Amino acid sequence: MALVPMVVEQTNRGERSYDIYSRLLKERIIFLTGAVEDHMATLVCAQLLFLEAENPKKEIALYINSPGGVVTAGMAIYDTMQFIKPAVSTLCIGQAASMGSLLLAAGHKDMRFATPNSRIMVHQPSGGFQGQASDIERHARDILKMKRRLNEVYVKHTGRTYEEVEKTLDRDHFMDADEAQSWGVIDKVLTSRLEMEGEQA
């Protein structure tokens, strides 16, 4: 079982303890860590909606360290990011692979960042199917439709052409932070929080 650090805050009513993620949520920071799956996606979407309700004009920071995961779960987070009123900044710490890289790219323009030693990976969706030939054929058609949709999302957020995106995503394509900036997944490589605050000032 993973240990979650607790922090203690002094108030005029005494002490109050929070788990570290709840305390950071008060600062409008959300962590997207680990595999992207339905339960995790629901928690991230709920936090985004909560922070929108608290203040629809104040930005939200999404910190990403994820190997990717289920496409539909990732698209639930993506759609919520686009749906809510606050601008969502994204910051890759560690890695943003597969759906993680799409969510990194989906941050508000000029507010998409990565730390210098981050790794970003983009690729086409994959899936394994078994059953009758007709069912496999339907699954294949569906995954091709999903591939086109994901390509369109990368085109929208990176400024690359559809052909460039399709070619790059044909196989696992790994990038360091500088390469991710050149490709359009992020806007800036950050070495210090001061640079992030300068961008948003």
From Swiss-Prot:
Active site, UniProt feature: S98 (nucleophile), H123
GO biological-process terms attached to the record: protein quality control for misfolded or incompletely synthesized proteins
PROSITE patterns: CLP_PROTEASE_HIS (PS00382), CLP_PROTEASE_SER (PS00381)
Chief location bin: cytoplasm
Compartments it resides in: Cytoplasm
Keywords: Cytoplasm, Hydrolase, Protease, Serine protease
Catalyzed reactions: Hydrolysis of proteins to small peptides in the presence of ATP and magnesium. alpha-casein is the usual test substrate. In the absence of ATP, only oligopeptides shorter than five residues are hydrolyzed (such as succinyl-Leu-Tyr-|-NHMec, and Leu-Tyr-Leu-|-Tyr-Trp, in which cleavage of the -Tyr-|-Leu- and -Tyr-|-Trp bonds also occurs)
EC number(s) recorded for this UniProt protein: 3.4.21.92
InterPro entries xrefs: ClpP (IPR001907), ClpP/crotonase-like_dom_sf (IPR029045), ClpP/TepA (IPR023562), ClpP_His_AS (IPR033135), ClpP_Ser_AS (IPR018215)
Stored PANTHER family: ATP-DEPENDENT CLP PROTEASE PROTEOLYTIC SUBUNIT
Its biological purpose: Cleaves peptides in various proteins in a process that requires ATP hydrolysis. Has a chymotrypsin-like activity. Plays a major role in the degradation of misfolded proteins.
Subunit structure: Fourteen ClpP subunits assemble into 2 heptameric rings which stack back to back to give a disk-like structure with a central cavity, resembling the structure of eukaryotic proteasomes.
Name by which UniProt lists this protein: ATP-dependent Clp protease proteolytic subunit 2
The gene coding this protein: clpP2
